[in-house]
Amino acid sequence: RSHCTHCKKQISLINLIPLIGFIKQRGKCKNCDEPISLMYPFNELLHLVVGIHVIYFFGISLMSIIIYTIFFVLYVLFILDLKHFYLPIGLNIFLGVLGITTNSIFDVFINDIDILNLGSASLSILGYSAGFLSLWTVNFIYRLITKKDGIGGGDFILFAGLGSIAGPLALAPILFLGSLSALLIVITNLKKYSNEVPLGSGLILGFIFYVLLKYFELLVNIVVI
């Protein structure tokens, strides 16, 4: 069961309740008074807010479960890459499978795109393939010149997964927004990211910004995406 990372004492069930446990303990372990990281209540609050908004827009439905699952997977990948420069292949592949399956069954994420009269399922597969090959090609050219990799393999599969969800036409704006986001992440901690960039975390932020801009029609009079 969960325990305090400082004194190793087990946490009571009532104190494991999201947000309530943190408030009840006043932000400290009840056994050793070690401050509890603010990341815990932040994570809990973030997922609560996202869950409420998903249900508000899509109701209590299978679609809500799928959308929240996509968010949860992206959140885990974001944190892992940000802290450890690690993007598990299993989660990345699951994201791609989820994107292709959802677009094939529900026709929801990329139903406004018309390329050669392709259906959502075909566009999802095309987005997956284009996402993978685009970053793979960039890294291949970089490797020919420098004799070393410039982009991690996990980033290829992650970008492919994002393409399977949003479609091939979304890849360019996601990459642009993701690159800017990755740059901002590096600027916030130059010491940690001096030799390696969490591109995956940046791409995930770029995807989220893209979704907000497109589906909530932000900047609709300025850009068309």
Predicted feature descriptions by range:
Residues 1-225:
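A membrane-topology feature that recognizes alpha-helical transmembrane segments
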